[in-house]
Amino acid sequence: SQPDQARQLISQAEEQARQLISEAEKKLSPKSFFQTIFGSYKNRTEDAIECYQKAGNLYRLSKNWFQASTAYKLSGDLNLEHNNRSEAANDYVQAAKCLEKFDVNNAIKFLLSAIEIYVDLGRFTMAAKLHNKIAELYEQGLELEESVQHYEQAADYYRVEDNYVYSKKCLLKVADYASSEFGNYNKAINIYQEIAFYDLKTQILQYNAKDSLFKAVLCHLCIDLF
């Protein structure tokens, strides 16, 4: 039956993953290190990284999110140790994707580790995307203050790369929450006006400026009322 076949495939994937983890550990063992006097230690490390990544993929396939995140973390730590920083950041992002299924706080920690690497490498668009992801995770958990902070950071990094469209999306989130949740109307007004003035300078966006200016007017009315 189909359910039996599915269970069998999951079982096979997990068994393969366990074998790959075991293989990686052997390659990194001191005994293995001494065997590489005539070989390449670097190659063994690369092999171990590959084993951990493949194990992560297999655990992910079987929806064993905890083991998958652990395998990606081990790969990421090894990559970082050997200065493969971009690869390490990617591993941490993969670990976070698995962790967000059951442990959002730890998922966020991994995303922050990846952001730190991407900022150091000058890859600000990647850093912005991950801040945006963290903002969404906090938003889902209704932790809106933290969410807004990360939307702001995402907007800043998008600005660095002159990516106005995505920066604007994040800033609108900040302004909407500033006005609707926190009663910070002055902050919201400044953001809405900034967005409107930019839209007015860009011919194809001019029509959008009305929305932002209307929201700014509403915020002014709220200040007058309260």
What are these regions (language model features)?
Residues 42, 62, 82, 101-102, ...:
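Structural motif corresponding to the intra-repeat A-B loop/turn of tetratricopeptide repeats
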Residues 9, 20, 27, 45, ...:
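TPR repeat positional signature
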Residues 56-57, 76-77, 96-97, 115-116, ...:
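Amphipathic alpha-helical segments of tetratricopeptide repeats
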